[in-house]
Structures are given as C-alpha cells and as structure tokens.
C-alpha cells in the first residue's frame, strides 16, 4: 500500500489517477481484524521510511485509517449493530465516537453507563463485528450537544473556568476520569480490545486560554493507563496551539485543502497526515435551511484522500438523533439552537437508510479492496400507522401536584443552582417560577433562553435574551406571577460556555422593586414524572386551546412495531413523549418537520403518546415512512 502524500514534499509518491486506484493489493487489511488478531504488542504507531515518507502501522503492518463517526448515545441501542454493519459494508475499518460527560454524569458523582449509554457494550460490539475504534473522551467534545458535553452542574460555581487548570474544574475532570478510564483500559488494543487511539480533549486550539491545560489532560489519560496512540483534533487555524507534545496532531476539514495539509505536515514532518473530521454535511438549526452537501463532492474528496494516502474519519457517517434535551446551541446574532435531528446529511440517514453518498463511497472503496466488501445489511422497514387523536389534556398549571416538591427561595436562581438532584441542580428542561405580586408596571428579568409570563393562568407576554422587559397591566388585589423558562440548549462551542446558566437570575423587578419569595418547580420531564402523570384526572381536550398544556393519546402499531416518523400538523412548539421517552423538540418554524420514532421504543398494539405543547393545540399526529427535514 503506497502511503503518503504531497509530491511537492515526497517525490515519487504523486497522487494516483482514478484508473490506477484499482490496485487490489492497496487495501488488504483482512489480517488486521480486531475479532481475529491474536498477537498484540505494538498497536497503532507512526513510522517514517528511508525516503522520509510517514505512515501508520498496526502491529507492524502499514495501515490506513478509514473511519466513520457514529455516536452511540444518538442511536437506539437496539440499532447499534445495524449501523456498525452498514459502516463495515460500505468499506470502513474504524468507528469513532465522542463520549459525553454530561450524559454519563448528569448528577455529580452519579454515573450512568446503562442502555443507550453503555459505552463498553458498544465498543465490544464493534470488535465482534471486526471494526477498530477511536475514542474521543473529552472532557469537552463539542458535538453539538448541550454545553459541548460538559455537565451543567459545573456552572454552579461561576469561578470554575471551564476547560482550564482551574482547581474546581480539574477536580471534577479527575473524578470523572477515575470512573471512565478504567472502563476503557481493557478495551485498548494491547489488552485485546479494538481501541487503537484516544483523543486528548477536542479543538482546544479554537478556545485555548490555558497553556497548561492540554498537558494536564494528556497526563490524566496516561496516568490512568491509556497506552494507545494519543491524538489532538483541530481546525487549520488551531492545529498548532491546540497540539500537545506526545500526541499526534490531526486536522478537521470541509474539503480537500492542500495548504492545510502542508501546514500540518510542516508542523510534524515525521508523522502521517490524519484527517480527524471530514464533514459530510452539517447540522441544522431552528429557523434555518436544511444543510445538504453533494454526494459527488464527497466522493471526489475522499478519492483524493485515498490518492494521497491520507488516513481520514468521516464526520458523520451516521448522525442519529438528539433525543430528549441533549441538543446544543450556538451564538450567531443571538442564541440559536440545534434541531432534534442530527441527520447531518450524513452517509447513512438519521433512520439508518442508505443514501446516494453511501453507494458512491461503497463503489469507490470496493474498487480498491483486495476482497469483496460484506453484503449490504437489509433496510429496517418503515410503517404508516393510524393518526393519533390526542383526546385528553391537562393545562400546565394542573400538573404541578405531579411534579417533585417545589423549592422555596427568597429570590430566583438559575436551574443549575436549584438545590435539587443531590446538589447538582437541573440539567435540562423547563423551570416554573412563581411569586405573588400586588401591583403592575414594568417587569424586568434576565431570561435564558425563553420565557412565557402569566398572571394566574392568563398569558401576558414573552421574555427572551433580546426582550427582557414586559409591561404588566394594573391588577386588582394580589395575583400569582408565573414565569415559565425553557433551556433550549446550551452553547456547545466558543468561550460563551462559561456563562450558559439557564433560567432566571436574582434580578427580577417590577418598576425597580425586587420581587421576593419564589416557589420554583422543576420540569425536567423524567420518566418518573410521566409515571405519576398517568394517575392524573385528564380532561376531554377542547377543539382549541391556547397556552402550555399536556395532551394524551394512543398510537396503535399492531403486533409488529417498526420505525416511523411523526408529523404534527398545526402544532407549534413542544416535545413528544412515547411511553415516557422524549423524542425531542418540534417547532413549526422548521426546517425539521418530522420526529424519528424508532421501532424498538414501541410496544405491540397501544402506545402512550404525550405531547407538551407550549403555544396552541393542534389537531392530531400523523405517521410517515419518510422524514421531512426541510420546509
């Protein structure tokens, strides 16, 4: 296999023409299979030959990383095998995944590696199927998830200085790594596992404000027993300042950018080029257009990677879904949120279906493979089920008895600082603040991200980061002021992560008078809440209703449930829960118009459907065989 790059640097290794690409010996790695390889001593390494050409080796054999990203936490566990088999059948030899700290440790000191978060099971499954694994444990990962994968309880202390060697932050990282890394150790290559490399942090070159931080994180991995190749990952502008001695610097790109590769090569000219992220598409945000990228462009770019002998990872091979409240956000002319679908216009669709990109890449990879690629796994069928009539409802303020006991505070605090969840605050969802007022006037409150304001149960307006003032009309006697605040997704990139507390701060005033004595309810929408809600006295839903409310109906799927997509005509903004599972947010501004409903999350026959709609009741819910990801 001819490895390397750039004829201007290494004469005699010019890129091949497309015709000559079909050399059958070029990509024969059948002897390097994690489920069969018995001798384990060297692991993934970098070497340079007598001509100055650098390349990867695995157990002493030349090796090219052909990777694709699939995040286990965005895919139903029942479909991990399906997605990994499709990765392999396309011609890839490696799967990469981030590890989200905020999902594994939602409450400080309470770790969850079960079900969809069972990292060890995911990695061992990849090994069984014959795939190598690259892990990206952060602690920060970006990945368009809430706070870039950092747990929200870190924001309880405003002086923590995330992603630095600040004492509070590092202590939290150390405790997390003390729990996480022992799970990874037996999965490493030299211990018989499939993990051939581990990434140190993520894109620190775009953030860096602590020269000692990357060295600390690297040592935190090494001191706990990580022995495989270490990597860093940055955009071109950050590859030098985001690097750390002892780790291979890799680059993230949107296309084949020769100058970027030259820059990386000059920085470490005795190392092979590795593209840690080649973006096959992009994420969508609410109110924007759906992003698409040409399949022909993807094929051409990856062909050029091959022709130059560059190792690469496709981000994303399969994007999956931002189930629940896990989506992130970013700041561009105000706060903007990532949609529920993480389809990403990836090689495999959100529901695991083949795309034009998939077939073009499979054909390309097959042309350079010494052995036939595995057969294509069958597609998972999609179904159309009878429409769901949401016949019963509960206005928001009727469900308060079914929530956990409220918190009584003199002045409001952000959701992260609520004294709940063993001192960890509230990570996701909504918060309802209530206090009694006896006069009207100008209400001023700093809100993150959006708030609906009520007098008793009557809506009087909206607050958000661009509108922190609302006039309250003259009132008779005293009334209950209610402010319902939603966390729409914490920013996942840039220095702004330091100040991403959600909810209300202490300064809530009317005509400059500070409001006091708040009752605060947490609406985190956990499974236990929906179990309690089953016993509520649901009412017959009217034809129309304005204001936040829960609606309940039943979806009948027959004896053999399978995947479908939910479409909510005439509904405006809210969340859908199937048998207590949060499918994610819907919003009529688009571009996403359907929600993916995995078949394994359905029961035979009847399934509970609960919709929390914030604005105004719609009519019914339809099911479809295909998604609608653009207006």
From Swiss-Prot:
Taxonomic superkingdom: Eukaryota
Gene Ontology BP term (one): galactose catabolic process
Keywords for this protein: Glycosidase, Hydrolase
A Pfam family recorded for this sequence: BetaGal_ABD_1
Gene name tied to this protein: Glb1l3
Active site: 203, 277
InterPro entries: B-gal_1-like (IPR026283), BetaGal1-like_ABD1 (IPR048912), BetaGal_gal-bd (IPR048913), Galactose-bd-like_sf (IPR008979), Gly_Hdrlase_35_cat (IPR031330), Glyco_hydro_35_CS (IPR019801), Glycoside_Hdrlase_35 (IPR001944), Glycoside_hydrolase_SF (IPR017853)
Any one cellular-component term (Gene Ontology): vacuole
A Gene Ontology molecular function term of the record: beta-galactosidase activity
EC nos: 3.2.1.-
Name of this protein: Beta-galactosidase-1-like protein 3
Gene3D superfamilies cross-referenced by the UniProt entry: Galactose-binding domain-like, Glycosidases
Family (UniProt): Belongs to the glycosyl hydrolase 35 family.
Alphabetical list of PROSITE patterns matching this protein: GLYCOSYL_HYDROL_F35 (PS01182)
